Amino acid sequence: TLAFYSNAELDMLHIPAEDEARKAIRILNPISENLSIMRTLLTPSMLNVIVDNLKKGNAEGRLFEMAPVYLAKELPINEHPHERQTLCIGAFGPEEDFFTVKGALEALAAGFGLSFD
């Protein structure tokens, strides 16, 4: 997904004003207001992909994205932001629930020799 979104997407997720995710770097010349800040979370993008899939008639799916998020050390920025690799997993459909995502995380962790015990 794109590395940009808008403050409106953070508003829809009810991200508090004092949350680190609100310390987004504003793009000086954005393509549109919908792509005006650098992402601090992957959640808005994941939700948009799920909505797009549902609109296209896909009744179920399991998705993941591993991509950087950009965290400003301070605003306005005076140095390069911290880029943190982040994993986001989403699932939708009548058979999907918390345990679907939990199982995906456990399988991924096991692949790296990790556990949640």
Predicted feature residues:
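Extended beta-strand-rich architecture
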Residues: 1-117
